[in-house]
Amino acid sequence: MSSGSIHVITGPMFSGKTSELVRRIKRFMLSNFKCIIIKHCGDNRYNEDDINKVYTHDLLFMEATASSNLSVLVPTLLNDGVQVIGIDEAQFFLDIVEFSESMANLGKTVIVAALNGDFKRELFGNVYKLLSLAETVSSLTAICVKCYCDASFSKRVTENKEVMDIGGKDKYIAVCRKCFFSN
């Protein structure tokens, strides 16, 4: 087994997870590693016409491959000699754990960016299962939009109760513990 690794970047909305993912991927690219970023095909928040880019909240972008299933990409990743795999919005991929573990066991570096919980502060997807498999876990915070303290939670500001409701500032705010419970 080659020496691969899994690195998890987690935090609430607006904490800079995608920016950190892009920064790490660019760092590997500068060292001539073959890299790819994969995003969920349902994430079209910033450009509905171009699904093959991952965007930060400040509208910086990087080329990406959009998919709803990571496992179907394995043959392409192996054939293309990809060494570093970045995955944005990993909470939306049902096969994130199996994919990340198998790629790391094949010698790939896997960098996963995902929410630390849903809008109710409950586990979101299977990302939490990666924590015990990861070499590193980076937990980011945002700034609470109400009191300007560190914010660890994402609060939905719409009435939709569906767990999967992709959006940005139009649907979510970052809040601290105290402000999560206030109106």
Swiss-Prot record:
Upper lineage: Viruses, Varidnaviria, Bamfordvirae, Nucleocytoviricota, Pokkesviricetes
Sites where the protein binds substrate: F119, V163, M164, D165, I166, G167
Keywords, alphabetical: ATP-binding, DNA synthesis, Kinase, Metal-binding, Nucleotide-binding, Transferase, Zinc
Catalysis: reaction(s): thymidine + ATP = dTMP + ADP + H(+)
Keyword Zinc attached: yes
GO biological process: DNA biosynthetic process; thymidine metabolic process
Membership in a protein family: Belongs to the thymidine kinase family.
Top-level taxon: Viruses
Gene designation: TK
Keyword Cell division: no
Annotated PANTHER family: THYMIDINE KINASE, THYMIDINE KINASE, CYTOSOLIC
Binding residues for ATP: G11, P12, M13, F14, S15, G16, K17, T18
Stated name of the protein: Thymidine kinase
Amino-acid positions noted as binding Zn(2+) in the UniProt annotation, renumbered to this chain: C144, C147, C176, C179
An MF annotation (GO) of this entry: ATP binding
EC number: 2.7.1.21
Catalytic center residues: E89 (proton acceptor)
